[in-house]
Amino acid sequence: HHDVHTLCTLSDGMGSGVKANILATLTSKIISTLMIGNAGIDECVETISETLPVCRERGIAYSTFTIVRVKHNGEVYTAEFDGPEFVMLRNGVLDEPEKEMRVIGGKEVWESHFFAEPEDMIVSFSDGVIHAGIGRLINLGWKRVNVMEFIQRNYDLKMSSRTMTRNLLEVCDHLYEGEPGDDTTVATVRIMPRTTTRVMVGPASSA
């Protein structure tokens, strides 16, 4: 969270386990730190390419990312690299913002710019979500269209972003039968009007 915007970054490192976690954590940290300092996506991608440790087995440094930045005036910027596309609901209905692709440092990054409306919900997730159930309850896994249908069907106007995230993770855990075959990460952003809280502080009553 920043004075002029709120930033949400989701990353998924190559492979699984500790190595993947390190790659994802570094990627998210680099993007968050640079963008809070008003750096652009070009600088973020270049820094990631120069910073991530190279895998000895595969000989590359790799991590997907999805960025959602919401300014306090409602302007939204998103950037996605090589992960599943985020799912957006507006008034409880699926909505697909217009996107443009740019090649940055050899990577195809999809960007979008739009203005949010109250109660918009943006759900980002790693490919562990769409791979849920492969070879188990669903032979070919859970497709993105299935994820979209689930999100829309389970959406409620009063639902928090945490609840949507938990619901999606729970159904993935069910499809994996409690044994995830891939790292599964979900991040949800819900647009809400700013509210004011007043706190009164004073000496304790002598009574």
Describe the role of every protein-language-model region.
Residues V18, L89, F125, A132-I134, ...:
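Short helix/loop capping segments that flank catalytic or ligand/cofactor-binding pockets
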Residues I130-A207:
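C-terminal catalytic subdomain
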Residues D12-G13, G83, M121-V129, D183:
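DG-centered beta-turn motif at the end of beta-strands
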Residues N21-G92, V109-W110, M159-R194:
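Catalytic core of PPM/PP2C metal-dependent serine/threonine phosphatase domains
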Residues T9-S11, T78-F81, R198-V201:
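Beta-strand scaffold of nucleotide-dependent catalytic cores
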Residues H1-T51, F115, V123, G135-V147, ...:
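Primarily the active-site beta-strand->alpha-helix module of PP2C/PPM metal-dependent phosphatases
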Residues H1-D3, E96-G135:
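Acidic loop->beta-strand submotif enriched in PP2C/PPM serine/threonine phosphatases
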Residues M14-S16, G83-F86, L94-D95, I130-H131:
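Short, surface-exposed beta-strand-loop junctions and turns on beta-sheet-rich folds
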